[in-house]
Amino acid sequence: HVLRRRQRQMCIRDRPHPDHLSTARDLAATAVAAIRDHPERYAVYREQSYTYNDITQYNRNHLLREDPSVDGLKTGYTRVAGYGLVASAKRQGMRLVSVVMGSSSTASRKAETRSLLNYGFRFFETLRPLTPEASLTEARVWKGQSKQVALGVTDEVVLTLPRSTASIDTQVEVDEPLVAPLNLNDVVGRVTLLRDGEIVSEVPLRV
């Protein structure tokens, strides 16, 4: 029940086919949540071995011993799904999560994961175009003690996009007129982020 509720919170809902137990997107979302919400527990996934009752078990994620940037996450195998690996790596402050499913062997899943991570780090970058500390605009307030209010975002906006020399453009739309009373974090518009004229993200504009 707890797991089902947590999955709903992470928007893990319908399955694409009645015979599928999960999807790569579901596994990636679960991995991201584990890394973000439970850092103290996530550290266990980088352990290469564990000894209990005089029995040593070795981590089957062999990339932990071959790539210092890899610090997790979970291997798996079923007859139907084949060999799989959900991995995560961090290089120069950028973290990526990869999901490989349906491999024919442990060697294959390791090679595919390494290739996928290398591709991601080579051709993608993580940008932080908006921070909560920055005021994006000011707007007129009607029927209030203050005539102007500063507007921005409440959470840092983090985007992982294909590498490009193009900058991120910001468009701010305010749902005017703004009439008092206004409360902190009230949504009063939207912020649209664009690269080369294409929308890459939209977030609420807040007081």
Regions picked out by a protein language model, each given a short descriptive name:
Residues H1-I12:
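Single conserved hydrophobic/aromatic residue that forms the stacking wall/gate
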Residues P18-V207:
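Domain-terminus/edge residues, biased toward the C-terminal soluble/receptor-binding domains
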